[in-house]
Swiss-Prot record:
Belongs to the UPF0251 family. Coiled coil: none annotated. It comes from the Bacteria. It holds the Pfam family DUF134. This is UPF0251 protein CT0950. Disulfide bonds: none annotated. InterPro entries: RNA_pol_sigma_r3/r4-like (IPR013324), UPF0251 (IPR002852). Signal peptide: none annotated.
Length: 153
């Protein structure tokens, strides 16, 4: 994925857990007319912290381990996408996002796994081959590395 902010590295955003649901479909829209809006996992986390838990942006930014300004950009993007989907009768899908490095500290005892956030498919990670270069054999969506998310207690 190309970095839209050339020269600026993308940093890991900490999320508490992966979303349990990865797609929302509008009722009454013919399948041929369905359009997708894709929310990244960090955008969903920003919505959860700011809108569901009612956290101030500065506190939510600290929890996600990003700057206040970055949090503001993430939440603005997420709200715009959700509004577009609701007003336009579009499907909301939650997929990967702008996560470029492992947020985990230390070595994991569990074997590395590539997962599909769309359908939940899992496959073993092949060392030296990024998960994002593979597609899910069930739904065709991009796979991501399961260890890309850190848990916040």
């Amino acid at each position: 994925m190309k970095n839209p902010r050339a020269g600026r590295p993308l940093h890991c955003r900490s999320v508490e857990e992966l979303p349990g649901v990865t797609c929302f479909l509008p009722e009454g829209v013919p399948p041929a007319r369905l359009r997708n809006v894709v929310l990244s996992v960090d955008e969903v986390e920003a919505l959860r912290l700011a809108d569901l838990e009612g956290m101030y942006h500065a506190d939510a930014a600290d929890k996600m381990k990003v700057s206040r300004q970055t949090f503001g950009r993430i939440i603005k993007s997420a709200r715009k996408k959700v509004a577009d989907a609701l007003v336009g009768g579009k499907t909301i899908c939650i997929e990967g996002g702008k996560i470029t490095g492992s947020c985990l500290t230390g070595e994991s005892e569990e074997p590395a796994v590539c997962i599909c956030l769309h359908c939940g498919y899992e496959q073993p990670h092949v060392p030296g081959v990024p998960c994002r270069t593979a597609n899910c054999p069930h739904c065709g969506k991009m796979l991501i590395r399961k260890g890309r998310y850190s848990r916040v207690d």
